Amino acid sequence: MAVPAQPSSPPPVCQFSDRLATALNAAQEATGTDSHHAHHHHTPSGASSAISHTHDNMPHDHGQFHDHGPGLWTPEEHGHTHEHLEHAGKFAERDMPDYTGRNWTERAFTVGIGGPVGSGKTALLLALCRGFREKYNIAAVTNDIFTREDQEFLIRNEALPAERIRAIETGGCPHAAIREDISANMGALEKLQAEFDTEMLFVESGGDNLAANYSRELADYIIYVIDVSGGDKIPRKGGPGITQSDLLIVNKIDLAPHVGASLDVMRRDAAAMRGTGPTLFTSVRNNDGVDAVMDIIVSAWRASQGNGKAKA
């Protein structure tokens, strides 16, 4: 089965600093190499996301440069796109989607699924595709760092026809592709929309840490998936994914007795961190709780079709 092509511009993870450029020029002069080394880099909000430069007038691209060489720069200087958070955030103060003037023919209602590696994001996406595909016109985009593993899993398990599942290889920090530079994911979603005129779109991020969360420009509804295998302390650790996602899912609850995790503790801590934010406890592999997730998504989708500012 043919694997669909993906957008060719993955998001950047780093920018060169002036200090690095100076060091490179000095090294070139010392070794007598050609001093022409014209760099062209972009900020996360830039129109282009490839890191490129030329040697001897021969252009080439560096997909993801993330080499913090010793002595070249400090974390404050190197132009990294990571956000520094003052606090975990509050559910009631999260960014809300604004549908005013939204053209749904360009991109349908988009559900973003995030969470740490191995929490069950892809299994959830598979279950949602199976549950929605007969009633709704849907498509999906997956994100991996260097592979198409999740796309291939979904195709192999016949979640949707292969042409409705696109893959992004981020080449670096997964959160950059869903927040700092969303161009690759946005492009894939818009192409799916143009081809299939979908009613709902799904995008799954690569596995990341608790600080990762979606940009509202990309995801109309944000689901964050954690699981019990990391211990019952995870909800109280906070982070935007836990505190500010529209829906928090605690997955693999069937494993709780085997890993010594207390669901009561996780339920208590999730409520303390999220306030009125909904939390569902699931065992996606056993199809436990999936219907409740689907019901919440459908309610959010229906509410969005009235346009205007979404309610917290």
Curated annotation (Swiss-Prot):
Keywords: Chaperone, GTP-binding, Nickel insertion, Nucleotide-binding, Virulence. Disruption phenotype: Fails to grow on agar media with urea as the sole nitrogen source. Leads to the inactivation of the URE1 urease and reduces the efficacy of brain invasion in mice. One of its GO terms (biological process) is urea catabolic process. The gene is URE7. A motif (switch domain 2) lies at residues 171-172. This is Urease accessory protein 7. NCBIfam families: ureG (TIGR00101). PANTHER family: UREASE ACCESSORY PROTEIN G. Belongs to the SIMIBI class G3E GTPase family. UreG subfamily. The keyword Transmembrane does not apply. A motif (Switch domain 1) lies at residues 147-154. Coiled coil: none annotated. Residues 36-87 are annotated as: Histine rich nickel-binding domain. One of its GO terms (molecular function) is nickel cation binding. Pfam families: cobW. Residues 28-86 are annotated as: Disordered. URE4, URE6 and URE7 may form a complex that acts as a GTP-hydrolysis-dependent molecular chaperone, activating the urease apoprotein URE1. It comes from Cryptococcus neoformans var. grubii serotype A (strain H99 / ATCC 208821 / CBS 10515 / FGSC 9487) (Filobasidiella neoformans var. grubii). The lineage of its organism: Eukaryota, Fungi, Dikarya, Basidiomycota, Agaricomycotina. A motif (GTP binding P-loop) lies at residues 115-122. It comes from the Eukaryota.
